[in-house]
Amino acid sequence: MILTHPAFAARRAFTFLEVMIVVVILGVLAAIVIPQFGTATQDARASALKANLGGVRAAIAGYRANAVLAGSPPYPTLTELTTPNTVVQGDFPQNPYNGLATVQTVSFAQASSRAVVNATTFGWNYYVDNAATPPVAIFYANAADDAGANASGNPIRANEH
C-alpha cells in the first residue's frame, strides 16, 4: 500500500494551454518593449554626436580666438586639429555612428554638401581654407545615419548637424 501525503495529492502540473497563454503574454510584452530600446539607442547616439560636434567646434573656435590675437592663421590645420592637446584637449572624440576618431580633409564642394567619404575609415570630415576671404572651416560627422528629426518630423542625418 502506497500512502501519499494529502498536500501532494492535490498538486498538479500546468496544462499546455496555460503555458501557451503565458508565452503569448510574454511575446506581446516583448513586442511592445523592444522597439523602445531601439529608439533609446538612436537618441543616445544622436545626443553623443551633438555633444562631440559641439566640443570639437568649440575647441576650434577657441583656437581661432587665440590665433587671431596672435596674428596666426585663424583655423587649425588637420595636423594641428588631430594632435592631442593642441586644439582638442585629450583624445579626439569618436563618431558614435561608426566608432572612429579619425579625421580626413575634404574639398569645399564635399564639405558644403556634407558628403560622406570613406565612412569605414574616417569618423569626421574637415575642410579648412585660411587663405579665403573670410577664412573658412567646416567640421562635420562622416556618417549619413538618421540622427533625429526636425520640427516637421523629417529625418536629420548625422552629417547634417
Where are these regions (language model features)?
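Conserved hydrophobic/amphipathic alpha-helical signal-anchor segments
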Residues: A31, Q42-E80
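Extracellular/periplasmic head regions of type IV pilus-like filament subunits
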Residues: A65-P135
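Short, surface-exposed interaction loops/tails
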Residues: A115-H161
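N-terminal leader/signal peptides at the extreme start of proteins
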Residues: M1-F14
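Alpha-helical hydrophobic helix detector
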Residues: M20-Q36
